[in-house]
């Protein structure tokens, strides 16, 4: 993969016109990302939803909750998934997807989302199965408490020092990124909008697994006790990081 410098396709007329963002997956995988994790990553998969929700699985566990496409709001004029969760703090909506693994030692993931109405919590998770082990990582945003947690080696959540605000008065799209190092079984960093936090040395949740090598990302929203909540998921980007 080409991660830096002038690409080998420079000044060559493309043979195929790209019409939708899903079409760039193969191109990105071969040529590398232009701007992911400070230009230090190669894109391996991009999930967007202008062609529908066929690339993901979506569930809602409470009557009245639902997941559907909307263009109000839109992200750069493209539809997003509206994860509508009813007024119940234990009510959850989930959107997730699986894929085949890629042989590498470090990975990153970026979630682009907006949230309207103050949710109880938002979970963004990444699981890799490779080499006979399963590695679980995740970031939790406690919207009502303005907190951030990471999924620790014991399978529970550890708070990250600081105050992290997810505005919910109108649909402002945020970027949440985190990177993990499989080889050293640790987190590397998390980036939430303008917040850059090092998690080097924080161990992943690791367990033996006989499952086929694969990855799985998940977004969960847990509702408010007062009002229905909307999480608008615009895109998910998976990368291999160059370290």
Task: Please give the residue ranges for each predicted region.
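Extracellular/lumenal carbohydrate-interaction signature centered on repeated Trp-anchored short motifs
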Residues: 96-109, 164-172, 229-232
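Extracellular, beta-strand-rich glycan-interacting domains
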Residues: 46-50, 227-243
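Short, aromatic/His-centered strand-loop micro-motif at the edge of beta-sheets
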Residues: 152-175
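Extracellular glycan-recognition surfaces and repeat-rich motifs
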Residues: 53-89
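Short tryptophan-centered beta-strand motifs in secreted/extracellular beta-sheet-rich domains
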Residues: 49, 109-111, 170-182, 188-192
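Flexible glycan-contacting loops in extracellular carbohydrate-active proteins
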Residues: 199-234
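Extracellular carbohydrate-recognition regions
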Residues: 2-62
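Secretory/extracellular carbohydrate-interaction modules
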Residues: 83-151
